[in-house]
Amino acid sequence: ICDCSFFGPHCIICEINGAHGQGHRHSLTSIHRAGTPFSTIHFYEHTMQAWSEGKTLHLGAEAEVISGTWFGRPAVLKKRRPRGWRHPDLDSSLTKKRMTNEIKLTIWLARRGAPVPAIWDVDIQEAKIIMERIDGKPLIEILRNNEHDEELLINVGKAIRELHRNAVNHGDLSTNNILIDKERKPILIDLGLSSREYDLEGFGIDLHVLHEILRASHPEVKGAMDLVLKGYVALDEELGKPQPAP
């Protein structure tokens, strides 16, 4: 997944004695958004100083999400929280693995135009990711406030199918991990448990998990999963049979 030749001789994403290991980090915005040549990528020392912190948006068992700005742009900082019940070495190893997985797949999907947020900065050692802030609400909130319609749920299905067409299983497809932006476009977040493989069983598990959540947490939304599946199937009808992802 990680194109080391794109990042130069030492890649911070696969961490092969890279810039990150030397205490440096760099902006990923121009890399995965515009494909900036390596020679024009500016490396920053301690770029987390460019982060201006706001309020905490979410404090969960796995991570804390904080709003703020990054070089003046609306952003969020996601910081993985240590799990006290796990051995520190095991916890550190699992956190690093999941963060690296999330970073790799999110950047790879963003390059292909999939509905995921842009990642702007990472710090593996401190378990931090800075990414663009999506101005919107999680699907769970939209459904609870009865702010949904048929078109929205159909578009959720299309977003999920777009992920699967790129041979990525989400791994934790809950209504908390689907954001709806101001234009009513679904954005898929939190890919720490995702995997890249064109696996029909994995796709089915994603859909089954979402179905169970909709049925248990949102029983008042009648036919929700039917609409999601309608959108899921419709995307293939619009775009044709998916081609193998390179």
What does each of the following model-derived ranges do?
Residues 2-4, 11-14:
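Cysteine-centered motifs
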Residues 117-153:
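Conserved structural core of kinase catalytic domains
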Residues 92-108, 112:
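The N-lobe alphaC helix and its flanking beta3-alphaC-beta4 segment of protein kinase-like domains
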Residues 44-59, 72, 155, 183, ...:
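Regulatory N- and C-terminal appendages and interdomain linkers associated
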Residues 187, 191-246:
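C-lobe/activation-segment region of protein kinase-like
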Residues 54-56, 61-99:
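ATP-binding glycine-rich loop module of kinase domains
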